[in-house]
């Protein structure tokens, strides 16, 4: 028997860059993982968001192709 305790089912989301980069808060909104910039700011400042496996507390952190954001059991892959 296996017991998996995830907040929500694992999901991988890809965001294709339209520009050179996307900011972390915008990426969370674009992926549909938060409803607003205010919520994005709170979860980021609370240390709930990882970028490439490291806690990131800057909402304005620029994300480039190849980077991975993790939040609430989900992964966002930034694609060029």
Report each predicted region and the residues it spans:
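A detector for short, charged/polar N-terminal pre-domain segments
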Residues: 11-22
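A basic, amphipathic helix-loop patch mediating RNA/tRNA/ribosome contacts
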Residues: 20-65
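A positively charged, amphipathic N-terminal helix/segment that binds anionic biomolecules
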Residues: 13-14, 68-80
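N-terminal amphipathic/basic-hydrophobic helices that include classical n-h-c signal peptides
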Residues: 1-11
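Intrinsic disorder/low-complexity detector
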Residues: 5-7, 37, 54, 74, ...
